[in-house]
Amino acid sequence: MSYQLDHIAIRVKDMDRAVAYYMSLGFNCEWESDDWSYFEEGIALLGPKYNRADPHFAMHIENEDQMNEIRKKLTDMGHHCDKPYKHRDGTVSFYTRDPEGNQLEFLYDS
């Protein structure tokens, strides 16, 4: 089973200011809305009203079968896994937390 870092999501208080900051550094904004923005370089900005996820890091996986395998392994180990969710960008993911409480997302392109 292989994983690839997909993105890191951070919370911001002022979306416009944060987007302008990253764009001034040469980051390429792929998606921008009032509650979250995403840059090609793998930075996701979560606005104050975004409540789908906490700050997290996301691992890109191959497909639904791999997602089911990971979810089963985690639940067998006693970890809670959210139900898979289809995002507006077409990806499907689920969230879980590591033993230290850090949120982790696993996602694939549907």
Q: Across the structure, where does each feature detected by a protein language model lie?
A:
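Vicinal oxygen chelate
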Residues: L5-K13, E32, K49-S110
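Generic alpha-helical propensity signal that fires on short helical segments
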Residues: Y21-N28, L45-G47, I61-E64, T75-H79, ...
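Residue-level marker for the onset of beta-strands and adjacent loop->beta junctions
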Residues: D6, L25, S33-D35, P55, ...
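Conserved short beta-strand elements that form part of the metal-binding/catalytic scaffold
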Residues: N28-P55, I61, Q103-Y108
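Core segments of cupin and vicinal oxygen chelate
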Residues: S2, A9-A44
